[in-house]
Design a protein with these regions (language model features):
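A short alpha-helical cap/connector motif
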Residues: 1-122
């Protein structure tokens, strides 16, 4: 649930991924700022950590993968080989919760469950 660990895990998983495979990441859409703190907050009934920051680093730097977050269960990120338009971010300064909240649809490529199912069937 910590950005640096998730970033390492995702990078390693991509090296092993079958060309037609997919990686599913949990906890990419924290419901409030307390959920995304690096240690579990007493103000939140759950914890996503800052997983979303690792996801965003790949959205901002990897054109060779396709990514979206399905709007369910604190955000399920789906990563597979393909292409994506990079999100323009200052990785040192932009990755704060308020920015995520304002830009989550664009930044995460956030899709509904129904839209995701349509993509799979299409």
């Amino acid at each position: 649930h910590l950005c640096e660990d998730v970033e390492k895990d995702l990078g390693n998983a991509l090296q092993c991924l079958n060309p037609n495979g997919a990686i599913v990441m949990h906890d990419c859409l924290p419901p409030n700022q307390y959920y995304q703190e690096r240690t579990q907050s007493p103000h939140a009934s759950g914890w996503t950590g800052d997983t979303w920051k690792a996801y965003m680093k790949f959205r901002a730097t990897r054109e060779d993968i396709e990514m979206c977050v399905v709007d369910t269960d604190y955000g399920c990120g789906v990563v597979r080989y393909g292409t994506q338009e990079l999100v323009q971010l200052d990785l040192e300064n932009d990755l704060i919760y308020d920015n995520l909240e304002k830009n989550k649809v664009e930044w995460l490529n956030l899709v509904s469950v129904d839209n995701f199912v349509e993509r799979l069937q299409g």
